[in-house]
Swiss-Prot record:
Function: Part of the ABC transporter complex SsuABC involved in aliphatic sulfonates import. Responsible for energy coupling to the transport system.
The name this protein goes by in its record: Aliphatic sulfonates import ATP-binding protein SsuB 2
Keywords, sorted A to Z: ATP-binding, Cell membrane, Membrane, Nucleotide-binding, Translocase, Transport
Keyword match Ribosomal protein: no
Organism in which the protein naturally occurs: Frankia alni (strain DSM 45986 / CECT 9034 / ACN14a)
Amino acid sequence: MGAVTVRGLRRAFGSHVVLDQLDLTIAESEFVALVGRSGGGKTTLLRTLAGLDPVAEGSVEVPALRSVVFQEPRLLPWRRVWQNVALGLPRSRGRDEATKALAEVGLADHARAWPLTLSGGEAQRVALARALVREPELLLLDEPFGALDALTRIHMHALVRQLHERHRPAVLLVTHDVDEALELADRVIVLRDGRLDEQIETRELFDDRRDPRFEQARARLLGLLGVTDTHVADPTATPSSAATAP
């Protein structure tokens, strides 16, 4: 059985149907990226899987242990960094586990810092530590790198890959960034007109973006999203800008 099983999910806001009889399965430890146009229902789906939005129609099966990382880190400014990570953990082991989680994301020396002293990338690493300290079976990422600069995004991508390999949760990443989706995910899905329109099994296609099939998959995804791409990639270069859906 998969970590996530969704059948016939429908969600509408007034007369606007956002999710239309949507079906989705995510296997245990699988990393799935979801791309689509703005307002197309990506975040609505993620919030439903997180239990933040109700299931009005259809069925949703998800693990009890799940965590969410949003674009904004949402740290409590009046609590120290380690206390933000330890929120909800038993007091007897909260500090030790928070410290270990911070070490995993390279912030062991920031445990007693205040959130307002952190850079954007550091704050998002704290949010990742907070999400993973509970060892979730499902990790939901809602455009977690969208507010970061290009260099910080590259570092965060590497960190997320390492953490996924170490902890092995199932992951759903919502993103507008096609390159990001292709580089991180085992499978990239396009959400269009409220349904999962098409998917690309990236793990079977290439190991890194220097493979020519990366550009082929990239062009295909951008075409599905209605984006005209004039970019010609240097396969030896690390991207400094993102190809994003409108």
